[in-house]
């Protein structure tokens, strides 16, 4: 199955999921709930700017809470959003990524709410296959600081529209690109430019993808390398040679008995 086929399947499924959600909480009601939430915390998003957190961090680790993946199945089915994200924060994460896709990643919006409830105060990335505005309302309501937009899932116009709305809601955008075809989206000027090292067609990861594509990114932007990072030396290379400031890592920590301690040990070797 090719990358386009997998994404087509996921996006088609996501449209059905969103329509079901809308029947449960109608769009107008979701807007009202989100507006009420935006009045809290002085109108600011919880966690503050993810971009600033990465740029000002010595490590730039975005620790991911991911219980499951399409390629590996369950990684940590028993993982609790009330425990692991807070442990990540205590052990040095610059920001968090929390999967909220149900079927493919075993995640829920409520996981972000739970993390915030127990005291997570650093930026949280809402990681899902975002294809329409309703999901941005969900992200803002549950306590996300930033949202992931995947170039391969969206037309350029759709991406621009969603990015503008995310900004109106006070959230930042991490735009994920995987290959040179996606780079026409770079001119939309997202807050953070992500390069995914995982081929969604084969699920093979190749960190060299970040080095290859980094040269094509605008200079002086916040670059994030996603997937396939397991060695502290790789993070050093990405930072020094590729100019990356963020490093999204999930499976490397989640497969360990204690993800937070695994993060601390990784950071100690940077």
Predicted regions and their residues:
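Glycine-rich phosphate-binding active-site loops on the catalytic face of alpha/beta enzymes
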Residues: 98, 138-158, 195-204, 243-263
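Receiver (REC) domain switch/active-site residues of two-component response regulators
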Residues: 8, 94, 145, 191, ...
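Catalytic alpha/beta core domains of metabolic enzymes, predominantly
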Residues: 207-215, 221-226, 230-233, 250
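Catalytic cores of alpha/beta
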Residues: 131-143, 178-189, 225-249, 261
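Active-site beta-loop-alpha junctions enriched in small/polar residues
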Residues: 13, 66-68, 101, 129, ...
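C-terminal helical cap(s) of enzyme catalytic domains, especially alpha/beta-barrels
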Residues: 212-216, 255-270
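An N-cap/entry alpha-helix motif that binds or orients negatively charged groups
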Residues: 2-76
């Amino acid at each position: 199955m090719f990358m386009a086929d997998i994404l087509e399947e996921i996006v088609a499924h996501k449209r059905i999921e969103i329509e079901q959600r809308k029947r449960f909480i109608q769009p107008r009601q979701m807007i009202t709930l989100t507006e009420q939430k935006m009045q809290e915390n002085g109108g600011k998003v919880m966690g503050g700017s993810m971009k600033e957190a990465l740029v000002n961090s010595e490590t730039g680790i975005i620790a991911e809470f991911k219980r499951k993946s399409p390629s590996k199945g369950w990684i940590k089915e028993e993982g609790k959003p009330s425990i692991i994200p807070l442990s990540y924060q205590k052990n040095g994460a610059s920001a968090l990524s929390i999967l909220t896709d149900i079927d493919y990643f075993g995640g829920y919006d409520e996981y972000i709410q739970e993390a915030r409830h127990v005291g997570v105060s650093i930026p949280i990335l809402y990681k899902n296959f975002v294809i329409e505005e309703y999901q941005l309302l969900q992200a803002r309501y549950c306590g996300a600081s930033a949202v992931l937009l995947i170039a391969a899932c969206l037309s350029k116009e759709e991406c621009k529209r969603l990015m503008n709305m995310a900004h109106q809601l006070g959230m930042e955008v991490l735009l994920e690109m995987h290959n040179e075809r996606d780079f026409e989206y770079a001119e939309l000027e997202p807050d953070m430019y992500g390069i995914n090292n995982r081929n969604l067609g084969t699920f093979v990861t190749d960190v060299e993808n970040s080095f290859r594509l980094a040269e094509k990114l605008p200079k002086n932007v916040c670059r994030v390398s996603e997937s396939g990072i397991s060695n502290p030396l790789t993070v050093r290379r990405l930072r020094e040679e590729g100019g990356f400031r963020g490093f999204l890592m999930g499976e490397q920590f989640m497969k360990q008995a204690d993800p937070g301690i695994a993060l601390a040990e990784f950071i100690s070797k940077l």
